[in-house]
């Protein structure tokens, strides 16, 4: 097994490798995974810039080793989005270990299909809504119950920015195939971090307020959706390499 890693550096460390301070890239025999610690809450210009930088780095890797590896995108810090992780606080371990994301149909020429992305992301939202009753039934804490009710909306508000990033990263060029996109997945490492309340921000902006009061939530210290991602998704696709 071979692994190449672009390490995410803290703000205290000087500089960052290839300017990709928010990404971690692992290259295995069976493919490449891109782990994003920041779930794309920046403005459009910042998102497209990061996608372009990352694309250039991956193409350099592929050209250097003469490969076109399948790429798996992992948004690894969902605890930084208000309400999302609280939704799963009362679920049993088997549910929290399930993969939460989508694997794309194989395309010889790479790229990502807009209709496929829309359908799969909307399906994930519908799964949250379908499981809301079970989530509420297992949680008596009122703050958590409020988060459970908000979680599908918070998750839905990530869709546009994630698509902007993925579409920019995997769009093809005239004389070459696009990068080999395989899927997008969401995880939480159990660590607490600063949170973004996308729903409150959207509502405040819609009524003319530029700022809103954000209340930090109780962090969820359980790991979510990471247990089987490597074994059940990435390693199972070894024949693509």
Regions found by a protein language model. Name each.
Residues 1-241:
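Basic, amphipathic N-terminal segments
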């Amino acid at each position: 097994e071979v692994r190449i890693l672009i390490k995410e550096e803290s703000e205290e460390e000087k500089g960052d490798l290839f300017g990709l301070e928010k990404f971690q890239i692992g290259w295995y025999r069976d493919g490449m995974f891109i782990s994003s610690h920041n779930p794309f809450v920046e403005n459009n210009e910042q998102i497209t810039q990061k996608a372009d930088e990352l694309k250039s780095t991956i193409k350099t890797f592929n050209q250097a080793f003469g490969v076109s590896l399948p790429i798996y995108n992992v948004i690894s810090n969902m605890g930084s989005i208000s309400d999302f992780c609280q939704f799963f606080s009362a679920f049993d371990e088997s549910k929290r270990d399930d993969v939460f994301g989508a694997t794309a149909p194989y395309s010889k020429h790479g790229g990502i299909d807009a209709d496929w992305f829309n359908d799969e992301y909307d399906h994930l939202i519908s799964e949250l809504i379908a499981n809301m009753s079970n989530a509420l039934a297992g949680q008596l804490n009122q703050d958590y119950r409020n988060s459970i009710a908000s979680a599908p909306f918070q998750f839905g508000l990530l869709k546009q920015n994630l698509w902007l990033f993925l579409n920019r990263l995997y769009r093809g060029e005239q004389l070459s195939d696009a990068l080999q996109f395989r899927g997008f997945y969401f995880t939480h490492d159990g660590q607490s971090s600063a949170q973004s309340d996308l729903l409150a921000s959207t509502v405040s902006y819609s009524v003319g307020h530029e700022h809103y009061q954000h209340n930090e939530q109780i962090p969820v210290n359980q790991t979510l959706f990471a247990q089987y991602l490597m074994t059940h998704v990435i390693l199972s696709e070894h024949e693509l390499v």
